[in-house]
Every structure is written in structure tokens, then in C-alpha cells.
């Protein structure tokens, strides 16, 4: 018999909606290969929430959202059932946080995540806000602080979607000294830069990215480098073991670049990317930065298309380790959340 894992979902936008679709389509695989069955006992969106101890019907949840209705309209629904209420009152094994990112206060996700961990729930996040603003305190409430008896906290979806940035650095390179990490961790700017390389202006490339659904109506966090900076902050805390706030290092975006800049780099045998970088210094800490950077054309991150993100770790004994991921929608991020759910469920 598969082990039943009760999950509570905060947020039911594209990411968690696709997670539900994956849980439905992969149910037999999850049971047969991993011995796991996931039961959605609570969910909330902007309308309120719904809960059922026996589990909500996934088909009904998906159909409700596809019909543009809120989950509070369900028979088990209530407009007062928000994320904080769910973690305080609902019996669940895992809290799955995918509400919109708030990089000012981290709320409401931060408080809900903290409460869930304090109550003994495992946590899986796609919302990077709580981690970027409060990683050290959340780590101490979870196994990420070193105490494996505490609830697990997983967040691989927060740093490059399906790209295994955290797992590669934290798990697969265990026992090494990471001399440096380089990453292209923002898909919007990667697409814009590769489009500008073909001769289009920044404004034209941005509009194209928006038309394709790759850029927000207000792209400020992406194009000014702050989304990438928040991801680097998470890497610094979780992989490099360096307590870091996003305001601790220099961040430069791409809005000043022109097509001529991109094409001149290509003519010089280079490509410009928005590079997240952490370099170990003589004191053993890491100098962090986010900035457009010209890389040699044979560099792994310079070879990527406009649809790809990637990370490269340089280590003392394992040499260079790199990974890339091509993503054209929210499904890979949802797949990363499934990876984390399997991890905490086993």
C-alpha cells in the first residue's frame, strides 16, 4: 500500500495548478515507483480556501480554476480560509507554498511557512520571498539548519525552476570546497539578451518576451536584476553557508544594454549574460554580485539559448560541475516541486 502524504497548498496559480495536473497524471508512477500517494487536504487562493480531511478531489480543483472560479466557491470552501489559518488548523504533513512573491515583507508566505515548520509540517516552496528575506531563521526551524530531526524544508523550484541549482551544490558536491558559483538564473533576461543579440532593441525584445508570457507587465524585478539577486541570496545561504541578505552585494540589471553591445561581444568571441556570481576570497567567504557579464563563447553559460538557464560550480576536488534547463512555461517549476515532495515524503 502506498504511503499517504497529506498536503496543503497555498496559492493556486499556474505553478500549483500544474502541480495538481502532475499529481493526477503521475499518480500511478508515484505509487508504484516511490510508494507515495498525495492527498490534497487543503488549498487556498485569492478567493479563500477549501479543506477536507479525506482529501479534495483533484479533478474538481483543476476544473474550478480552469473555469476561472475561486476554490472558496466549492462546497468545502470558505472565504476566511487563508494560508495562515490552514497551517494553524488543518492536519497536513506538507505545506506547499506558491503564493505570489513579496520581496518587501515576504508575507503572507513567510508567516505561514514559519508556523508550518513550528507545528512540525514539512515545507516545499516555489515562493522565493520567505527564503530571500529570512533564510537563516527558517533554516533553524528545519533540517536545513543541520538538525535532521526537524521538519524538512525544500525549495529547489525557487532557484531556476527545474534547474537543480540547490541539489547540485548542496548534495552532489558534498565534501568539496566550492571555489565559485556562476549562474544564469533569470529566464526573462536571458531571453531578452539573446533576442537583442539578433539586432532588436531592448524595448522590442522586452515586448516580445511579454507577448510570449515570459515577462511580467511590470518587468522591473527581472530586468533590474533583483529576481536573479534573490536567487543568488538563496544559493549563498543554502549552498555556500554564508548568511546573506539581498542588499549585501551589488546588483546591476540589463536596461542600459543595446543591441550593439550584444553584437560587439559576439564579434569578440563572447556573449553577454546576466550573471549571478559568488567567488571564494582569501578569508573563506564569498564575494557576490549580479551583473551583465561577457563570457567566452565556449563557456557553458554562453552556449545557452534564450530558453535556457544554467549553473556552474567550480570546486577543489570535483572540478567543474554544471547543469542547464530549458523552460518554456510553469510546468518545469511544478516538476521541481514534485521532486521536493518526493524527497520529503520518503
Regions flagged by a language model, labelled:
Residues 142-150, 154-215, 226:
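Rossmann-like NAD(P)H-binding beta-loop-alpha module
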Residues 195-196, 206-303, 308-310:
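Substrate-binding/catalytic subdomain of NAD(P)-dependent oxidoreductase enzymes
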Residues 10, 14, 18, 38, ...:
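Conserved active-site and cofactor/substrate-binding residues in soluble primary-metabolism enzymes
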Residues 299-346:
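ATP-dependent carboxylate/acyl-activation modules
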Residues 94-97, 124-126, 153-157, 180-183, ...:
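General beta-strand structural signal in soluble alpha/beta enzymes
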Residues 1-118:
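N-terminal glycine-/serine-/threonine-rich beta1-alpha1-beta2 phosphate-ribose binding loop
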Residues 100-119, 128-155, 169:
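Rossmann-fold NAD(P)-binding glycine/threonine-rich loop
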Amino acid at each position: 500500500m502506498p504511503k499517504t502524504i497529506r498536503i496543503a497548498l497555498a496559492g493556486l496559480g499556474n505553478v500549483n495548478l500544474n502541480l495538481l495536473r502532475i499529481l493526477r497524471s503521475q499518480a500511478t508512477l508515484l505509487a508504484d515507483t516511490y510508494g507515495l500517494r498525495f492527498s490534497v487536504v487543503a488549498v487556498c487562493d485569492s478567493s479563500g480556501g477549501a479543506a477536507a480531511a479525506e482529501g479534495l478531489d483533484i479533478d474538481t480543483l483543476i476544473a474550478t480554476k480552469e473555469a476561472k472560479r475561486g476554490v472558496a466557491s466549492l462546497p468545502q470552501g470558505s472565504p476566511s480560509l487563508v494560508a495562515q489559518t490552514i497551517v494553524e488548523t488543518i492536519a497536513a504533513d506538507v505545506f506547499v507554498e506558491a503564493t505570489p512573491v513579496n520581496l518587501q515583507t515576504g508575507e503572507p508566505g513567510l508567516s505561514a511557512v514559519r508556523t508550518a515548520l513550528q507545528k512540525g509540517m514539512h515545507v516545499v516552496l516555489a515562493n522565493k520571498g520567505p527564503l530571500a528575506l529570512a533564510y537563516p531563521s527558517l533554516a533553524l526551524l528545519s533540517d536545513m539548519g543541520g538538525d535532521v530531526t526537524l521538519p524538512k524544508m525544500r525549495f529547489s523550484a525557487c532557484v531556476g525552476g527545474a534547474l537543480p541549482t540547490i541539489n547540485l551544490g548542496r548534495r552532489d558536491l558534498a565534501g568539496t570546497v566550492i571555489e565559485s558559483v556562476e549562474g544564469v538564473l533569470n529566464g526573462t533576461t536571458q531571453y531578452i539578451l539573446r533576442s537583442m543579440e539578433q539586432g532588436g532593441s531592448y524595448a522590442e525584445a522586452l515586448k516580445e518576451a511579454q507577448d510570449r508570457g515570459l515577462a511580467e507587465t511590470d518587468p522591473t524585478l527581472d530586468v533590474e536584476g533583483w529576481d536573479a539577486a534573490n536567487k543568488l541570496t538563496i544559493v549563498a545561504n543554502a549552498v555556500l553557508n554564508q548568511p546573506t541578505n539581498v542588499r549585501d552585494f551589488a546588483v546591476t540589471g540589463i536596461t542600459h544594454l543595446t543591441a550593439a553591445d550584444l553584437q560587439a561581444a559576439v564579434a569578440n568571441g563572447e556573449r553577454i549574460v546576466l550573471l549571478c556570481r559568488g567567488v571564494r576570497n582569501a578569508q573563506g567567504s564569498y564575494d557576490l554580485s549580479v551583473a551583465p557579464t561577457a563570457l567566452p563563447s565556449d563557456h557553458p553559460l554562453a552556449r545557452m539559448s534564450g530558453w535556457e538557464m544554467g549553473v556552474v560550480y567550480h570546486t577543489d576536488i570535483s572540478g567543474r560541475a554544471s547543469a542547464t534547463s530549458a523552460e518554456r512555461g510553469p510546468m518545469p517549476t511544478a516538476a521541481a516541486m514534485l521532486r521536493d515532495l518526493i524527497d520529503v515524503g520518503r
